[in-house]
Amino acid sequence: MLIVCLSVLPERMQQRGGEQGREAALALEQEAQPQREAASGRGKQRDSGDESSPASDGSLSAFARGLQIGVKLNNDNKVETVPLEWYVRGVVAGEMPADFEMEALKAQAIAARTYVVRKLLRSGLSDEPLVSDTTDDQVYIPLERLDELWGDGKAKEKLARIGQAVEQTANLIITYKGEPIQAAFFSTSNGYTENSEDYWDLALPYLRSVASPWDKQLSPRYKETVELSHTEARRKLGLDRDAGLAMRVTSRTEGNRIKEVQIGGRNFSGREVREKLGLKSSSFTWTVSRDYIRITTYGYGHGVGMSQWGANALAKEGKKAADIIAYYYTDVRVEQASKLPRSS
């Protein structure tokens, strides 16, 4: 049995929509230096001539039909092996609410499949099933657990909708200049998406900032306020216990998130503050009172790529999955994986 090793990328916090692959940071940061040296054509699996090679016949489709993907179920400490398209179903179930519009579900399915195909071509085959079911990769929910997860007696209906989205997009992936993209996605924007280099220090031409105004009105995750004691904030930020806590924003990203900020005499990136304090977004305001700090965040997730709530809004407006993808990913194409060029 062939098992794909996909220990990689694109964030999700929990079942109802979020981010991928530790926000895709691991994969993107690991690839940053090589991609600076060579713009494309990296990491393809060699053509061994074996029929188990996805490129041995110049096509991925025949291989993919029999492909089994090993998924590490962290809570159970075991591996589940499932066909590729069933894996995509489990990811869509884990990454997007099943009651979202059909075209949004289709866009999510295409993004999830693109993730797998990209990693397959870059990582090749392995006996080690290292795809996690968590945000270290893509959130994956075993299909037999969906009834328990959803808990509303509608698992059959919801799974049918997800199955429809996956089946109607079968073999479709997102490409840029003929190669699968890093199909980053997240839950909710602050009104704009981010340029990839403003979060991961790696500029990808298809991950550009665009307006996403729908999130504010539609997403329940758009705004959140948390309070931290002065002691807790200093501890998490690594500041001296007598350091001041006034915040001064020194620069912002094109997506209007905090790029650089000064707190307690130290410089931080917006991402650093987000991760150290466990914030939902790097778009935030900060108010210091006598006893605590009140932080209000706008949006949920890293902000790079497709906003899921924005995608749902576009679908409600009548946009198709291809339109949604074209809006959030710049200058890309949606095409059959079987049309990928033969590996060299």
Model-derived segments and spans:
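Conserved, single-site charged/polar hotspot
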Residues: M1-S344
